[in-house]
UniProtKB/Swiss-Prot annotation:
Annotated compartments: Cytoplasm
Organism: Bacteroides thetaiotaomicron (strain ATCC 29148 / DSM 2079 / JCM 5827 / CCUG 10774 / NCTC 10582 / VPI-5482 / E50)
Protein name as catalogued: D-aminoacyl-tRNA deacylase
Gene designation per UniProt: dtd
GO cellular component: cytoplasm
Motif (Gly-cisPro motif, important for rejection of L-amino acids): 138-139
Gene Ontology process terms (BP): D-amino acid catabolic process; tRNA metabolic process
Length: 150
């Protein structure tokens, strides 16, 4: 699984002109799933996300997790995170999982992340044409890949 975490002041996702989800201060997470992903990847990411210290403490130092800061999370599925630009100029998405694999994993990821956070999270709709709005805070943007745990 590959994710992009952005610290935001607020974020929302709109589908067909209707706001599906919106959050205040917290994280916007874009998530891409590949064929070989499974529960181990979900578990590692959920633990890492809720404990990631990217929120400022009283001294202005990024020393607090979203659990400590009380922020919200909005998760958006994004198969394009697995784009390969190795050949030519048109990205290939061959590494992205097909919907029959990625939809259940995305839903499980959202459910498990909500449980780890201790409250409901916002989500987009898998496969929909979404308009995502956000106000980056910092900006702070962190990329994580369960196949390359650095």
């Amino acid at each position: 699984m590959r994710i992009v975490v952005q610290r935001v002041s607020h974020a929302s996702v709109t589908i067909e002109g209707q706001c599906k989800s919106s959050i205040g201060k917290g994280m916007l997470i874009l998530v891409g799933i590949e064929e070989s992903d499974g529960q181990e990847d979900i578990d590692w990411l959920c633990k890492k996300i809720v404990n990631l210290r990217i929120f400022d403490d009283e001294s202005g130092v990024m020393n607090k997790s979203i659990l400590e800061d009380g922020g919200e999370i909005l998760v958006i599925s994004q198969f394009t995170l697995h784009a390969s630009t190795k050949k030519g100029n048109r990205p290939s998405y061959i590494k992205a999982a097909k919907p029959e694999i990625s939809v259940p994993l995305y839903e499980r990821f959202c459910k498990d992340l909500s449980r780890a956070l201790g409250k409901e999270i916002g989500t987009g709709t898998f496969g929909a044409d979404m308009k995502v709005e956000l106000l980056n805070d910092g900006p702070v943007t962190i990329c994580m890949d369960t196949k390359n745990k650095e």
